């Protein structure tokens, strides 16, 4: 069992996707319908079709609770109404048009560490343009865009628990393969002289 887990974790590391490094220094822009700011507690609550943009990072949900650390880094928790999903999308460095996107019942984003956690019915996809290259489905997925690491667990707590279900990893072919050339037709045997 430990060997299977080690192989799965190795596969997840191989699926690494680096977020666009320029996003780190960008300002955050938050669109909302309703806003409540508590300066003493350093908490902001926004509701109503929330869109958070920070460089190429885009987070969407129905509600966001934004806490500011003493170092002035944001921790954002996005939730939504039943039947809907919170989502994120971010451009990655490298390649012609690489992206990573995902959705879950709850999304947590830590500005200091650039980690996105997807909790509850989580899905994450890597794309080249609009073509999916890889996908992970699990109850909990953590995406560390600075270290280029994905981690998935079968329980929304972020732990792997026996009997809690299974995740799924889909890996697309890395390059197009050409069909092998057709085999040459078999040469009929030469006629034999039976006389």
Task: Describe each PLM feature range.
Residues 1-195:
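Mature-chain termini and adjacent capping regions
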């Amino acid at each position: 069992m430990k060997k299977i887990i080690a192989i799965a974790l190795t596969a997840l590391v191989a699926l690494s996707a680096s977020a666009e490094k320029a996003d780190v220094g960008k300002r955050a822009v938050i669109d909302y319908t309703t806003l409540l700011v508590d300066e003493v507690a350093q908490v902001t609550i926004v509701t109503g079709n929330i869109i958070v943009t920070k460089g190429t990072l885009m987070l969407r949900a129905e509600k966001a609770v934004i806490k500011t650390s003493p170092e002035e880094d944001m921790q954002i928790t996005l939730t939504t109404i039943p039947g809907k999903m919170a989502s994120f999308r971010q451009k990655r460095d490298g390649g012609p048009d690489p992206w990573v996107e995902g959705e879950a019942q709850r999304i947590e984003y830590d500005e200091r560490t650039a980690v996105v956690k997807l909790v509850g019915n989580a899905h994450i996809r890597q794309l080249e343009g609009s073509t999916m290259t890889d996908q992970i489905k699990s109850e909990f997925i953590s995406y560390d865009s600075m270290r280029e690491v994905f981690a998935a667990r079968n329980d929304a707590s972020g732990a792997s628990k026996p009997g809690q279900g299974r995740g799924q990893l889909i890996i697309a072919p890395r390059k197009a393969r050409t069909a092998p050339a057709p085999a040459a037709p078999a040469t009929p045997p030469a006629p034999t002289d039976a006389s």
